[in-house]
Amino acid sequence: MAKGTAKGAAKRGKIKAEEPASPADASPRLPAGRHGLPREFITQNQRERIITALVDTVAERGYNATTVAHITKAASVSRRTFYEHFADKEACFLAAYEMVADHIRASMGAAAKSFGEWPQQVRAALATMLRFLASEPELARLCMVEPVAAGGEIAARHRATMQDFVRILKAGRPEHSGERPLPEATEETLVGGIVSLIVREISAGRSAELEKLLPDLVELILSPYLGTEEAERLARTDAAPTAD
């Protein structure tokens, strides 16, 4: 992952898959009156403030209890300005979610490419995701907990995002040497279990402890493919991969 904290950049809409995240705080409020700033700057500033406000408000209240009024108050913008940028609360949430998900996806991919063997690729990708979620508790809740509570298109988008990790795991099927082939639902079951464990920790206020799950999660993932002994050996190795 890029150096420094990604939270400010993510909340301001700055996280992109092709760009590193950098330290940043929420966008400052625009000065009142005739400021002479370019319209493009004003528009971008407003959008960033709205997304920042959504992340903060959802972290405090949860998605379902958050209203457009809460968001506009936190962003210091009018309802009219909000609807100039987003069709509704769901669209605003999805904009924030996609930026964070894209960043995590790109970071995991970059980490995995640093290793030639599939087991190490899995470990590197998972370590990168856990590190990001542990360092950004508000964004961890945004992208792992709230989509399930929100339901609808947000939950559907979250399920689609989780398929990225399913594809990473399916690449390991040639590693399987057992007599019986792996069940078709193996990867979906593994990802579902991983997500459930991560959500449990975030919901309990233990986001900062997420990286401690890495050995157990790696062992859980690799066991069906490599067998329990080899999976445990790789999971307990001290050489933790990084994406920095």
Regions found by a protein language model. Give the residues of each.
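Short, structured motif recognition centered on aromatic/hydrophobic residues
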Residues: 63, 104, 139-143, 194, ...
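Amphipathic alpha-helical packing segments from all-alpha helical-bundle domains
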Residues: 152-175, 184-196, 212-220
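Hydrophobic alpha-helical connector segments
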Residues: 109-138
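Basic, helix-initiating cap at the start of DNA-binding domains
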Residues: 2-61, 68-74
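Short, basic, alpha-helical segments at the C-terminal edge of helix-turn-helix-like DNA-binding modules
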Residues: 68, 97-105
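C-terminal peripheral helix-coil segments that are non-catalytic and often amphipathic
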Residues: 1-34, 131, 167, 171-174, ...
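Helix-turn-helix
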Residues: 57-91, 95
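Amphipathic alpha-helical segments used for helix-helix packing
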Residues: 133-152, 166, 170, 199
